[in-house]
């Protein structure tokens, strides 16, 4: 019997911020979340960094690093984001101080601005619309079972038959997130971007919405269909819920060991390994090179910045960390100590 391998927990490779934009593309942004602390430090001067700061009681100690360039005076903080969270998710003062001291923040895309840009939304969703075929034709014999399951769980939409299977899988991801007790409204992007907008901190998108939607629409069809197949049936959904709960717990405690052991796919378990490798290169390899290039360019210019991208981008090889180290930079982990229970983030 094959032992179930720990996978990156969602059918859409952790792109939960994109899930909600797909399903509620004109939804209002919810920004209510408690943030620990409110102190600010003088801008335009690198911070003195503690590698084991105290995190206020109740705060998450999520994956966090810093990389500096002594020759230029640059200091860039790197936060691993979680695209969904809980209403009581709180970020520690050492994270907020780093954000407020930065000249800019850099997410994959500005999800807050995207939520209010209806023209861009309409442009982006077109990348997920099928051309010359229907979802029923692509899904084939599993179509009726899939539709019935989606209807039963309240995630069916009449427009789905004209959308790529990835869109369907994203709908199922929203079900997983909900069953895991999480909400994308409280994900890292919405929380920190709302704060940045409120405080007038410059926002620099590393990719942007259109680039992400274009990529999602071009995922190999065999990968989209296999991903969707794992989103049908209570056993599949419940397994994803358990993985998602584990993911959130590991993220909350900066659990290096957990993330280092995650896999995106197993060549022995997929129908077309070459398509899955193409997907991996699209989702991770190519994007992480762009992220690393963005960071190294900022370091060479002596900038103070705050980058937050999906946590797996710091672990899936060639990771952002590996690429920065290949350029001669040292990336230092900042592991918060939880004040409430004395736990050191693993």
Where are the language model's segments positioned?
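Short, surface-exposed loop/strand segments
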Residues: 58
